[in-house]
């Protein structure tokens, strides 16, 4: 567990029995939803996003805890989710297949980061790369 140390890559997710994020295709699990979080082409490939605000650029994250969406933040931290924990990952822990970049909309109330594929790859390979980061996410204990 780690204390919040300012900016980084944060995501609120459900904790599994083993103390790591739950894998799955949902907004509060470690995974990406095809057609929602990223859009595969007709051949099932995903590509490095342009990181345009509002586009489906990949795994949705935030640069600070305060920028996480209220529906995902744990109740005890002032959010509305009774099941989530706040997690942090270092950009260097993403691996060569993934890239993170801020893609905040100009008039947005909160800032946003997406973790997308670093190049062209089949969707399933991208999903595996995201889920392979599971052990790299650390729980944040104080905000």
Describe the residue ranges of each PLM region:
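NAD-dependent ADP-ribosyltransferases
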Residues: 1-143
């Amino acid at each position: 567990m780690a204390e919040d140390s300012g900016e980084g890559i944060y995501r609120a997710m459900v904790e599994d029995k083993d103390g790591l994020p739950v894998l799955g295709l949902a907004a509060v699990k470690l995974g990406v939803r095809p057609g929602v979080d990223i859009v595969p082409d007709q051949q099932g490939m995903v590509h490095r996003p342009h990181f345009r605000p509002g586009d489906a650029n990949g795994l949705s994250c935030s640069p600070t805890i305060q920028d996480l969406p209220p529906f995902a933040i744990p109740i005890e931290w002032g959010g509305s989710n009774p099941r989530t924990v706040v997690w942090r990952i270092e950009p260097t822990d993403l691996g060569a297949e993934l890239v993170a970049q801020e893609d905040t909309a100009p008039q947005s109330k909160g800032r946003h980061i997406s973790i997308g594929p670093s190049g062209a790859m089949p969707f399933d390979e991208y999903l595996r790369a995201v889920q392979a980061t599971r052990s790299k996410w650390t729980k944040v204990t104080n905000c």
